[in-house]
Swiss-Prot record:
InterPro entries: G_CP_dom, NA-bd_OB-fold, P-loop_NTPase, Ribosome_biogen_GTPase_RsgA, RsgA_GTPase_dom. It is found in: Cytoplasm. Residues 1-27 are annotated as: Disordered. The gene is rsgA. GO terms for molecular function: GTP binding; GTPase activity; metal ion binding; rRNA binding. This is Small ribosomal subunit biogenesis GTPase RsgA. It comes from the Bacteria. Monomer. Associates with 30S ribosomal subunit, binds 16S rRNA. Its cofactor is Zn(2+). PROSITE patterns: ENGC_GTPASE, G_CP.
Length: 350
């Protein structure tokens, strides 16, 4: 390879810097302070590239530009913004976001090129939605629970589409959900189709800022349609007949207000919740039932697998820890290692 030829990684960085300079040049003349009114408090309802929809104290939503000094802005951020004044030609000027208040929490997901990417801010509850279709995946539930424990945000597990279960199926699903009930997690069984179980869900959402999370096709948008009412209807898509997987419908995270009180952030569906940016120790801490056994293994560097004298494995064998959870713990660690290997390979200069 020629010494003067740029690698793929170097080309990405050059292109990114070029685009950044173009944006900076384009913005310099755009934000004249005389075009804006007095500062006010607001909350980001949604983010679209270099613009954001900001809701003011009176409930009005304003499309705003974003000061280039603001490095990160996501749905749920509480901000200081200024409304745009009417221009001389009678054309309204967009408002502008001036500053972002300190966040109480931020939900992130790993990204190959951008590191850790924020999704939503100031949430105090993550609603983990699962369903028997496209499949009841305890592995995905466990991934979200690890994320909740790492963020120290309270989780709520919601199993949707229970109207599709017969008595035998309901018994099986309850047995699976008891794994989580037995370690202190709250589980609600609902149907967005028949609206069974929606009242307890409404109560759990009241007074909270929640985000609905889960793989595509589990009915997040259908649940939100039922909870929000037709006037706020969100697009939905059925499970694909070909793949059995859900088809993504929501394209940008957006905050909605429930009629019964409380807010929700609807975010794009994901088929797998990435945790590869975390350390293995954080994954271990994310399994709450492990806590009583940590520090009691025979060896300090115990991997909690086939190591002799592993207190966690002994707890699994004794029935104190669910075998399914223990298996998912190792699946998560294995998937993290695989993704990190791929990332390191892609970052290697050609």
């Amino acid at each position: 390879m020629s010494k003067n030829k740029l690698s793929k990684g170097q080309q990405r960085r050059v292109n990114a810097n070029h685009q950044r300079r173009l944006k900076t040049s384009a913005e310099k003349a755009d934000y004249d302070d005389n075009l804006f009114g007095e500062p006010a408090e607001g909350i980001v309802i949604s983010r679209f590239g270099m613009h954001a929809d900001v809701e003011s104290a009176d409930g009005e939503v304003h499309r705003c530009n974003i000061r280039r000094t603001i490095r990160s802005l996501v749905t749920g951020d509480r901000v200081v913004w200024r409304p745009g004044k009417a221009a001389a030609e009678g054309v309204n000027v967009k408002g502008i976001v001036e500053a972002v208040h300190e966040r109480t929490s931020v939900l992130t997901r790993p990204d190959f090129y951008d590191g850790v990417k924020p999704i939503a801010a100031n949430i105090d509850q993550i609603v983990i939605v699962s369903a028997i279709l496209p499949e009841l995946s305890l592995n995905i539930i466990d991934r979200y629970l690890v994320g909740c424990e790492t963020l120290q945000v309270e989780p709520l597990i919601v199993l949707n589409k229970i109207d599709l279960l017969d008595d035998e199926g309901m018994d099986f699903v309850n047995e699976q959900m008891n794994i989580y009930r037995n370690i202190g997690y709250r589980v609600l069984m609902v149907s967005s189709h028949t609206q069974d179980g929606l009242k307890p869900l409404e109560e759990a959402l009241t007074g909270r800022i929640s985000i609905f999370a889960g793989q595509s096709g589990v009915g997040k948008s259908s649940l939100l349609n039922a909870l929000l009412g037709l006037q706020n209807e969100i697009l939905t898509n059925d499970v694909s007949n070909v793949s059995g997987l859900g088809q993504h419908t929501t394209t940008a995270a957006r905050l909605y207000h429930f009629p019964h009180g409380g807010d929700v952030i609807d975010s794009p569906g994901v088929r797998e919740f990435g945790l590869w940016h975390l350390e293995p120790e954080q994954i271990t801490q994310g399994f709450v039932e492990f806590h009583d056994y940590l520090g009691h293994c025979k060896y300090r560097d115990c991997k909690h697998d086939a190591d002799p004298g592993c207190a966690i494995r002994e707890a699994v064998e004794n029935g104190a820890i669910a075998e399914t959870r223990f298996e998912n713990y190792h699946r998560i660690l294995e998937s993290m290692a695989q993704v990190k290997t791929r990332k390191n390979f892609s970052d290697t200069d050609d």
